[in-house]
Amino acid sequence: LQYLHVSLWEFDKKIRRGGDTAQTRMQFIHERINGKLPLIGVGNLFTADQILAAYETGWAEFIALGKTVMINPHIATQIREGREDEIETQLDSTRTDHYGFPDTLWSSTSSGTQSWLPPVKGAEWKPMDI
């Protein structure tokens, strides 16, 4: 095993059972592996501030982005060039050509009803609470 990639609905979600419920799951895992391998963490980080805050916790050596990259395919460049104000946190269903999704994925995504997909402007979205 070269690394551990932990994908959570929320990066800073607290432990529910089997441990200190005041501690986050990511922090618990990081402490448990104790530097034996790098930890990659992900979990609904949509803005540059959220990404930086997650990294600065020290709970993960690397931060991964899932839904955020679907919405902003060039997010690394946007952050590097100081264009954080251009980062979108919701899909715009009127910009079909902007995202480059295959038709089936676009159909599922633009409906805004799947919490495992990015939020859509004008649609209620709430991450799953698991």
Residue spans of the language-model regions?
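Flavin-dependent oxidoreductase catalytic cores
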Residues: 1-130
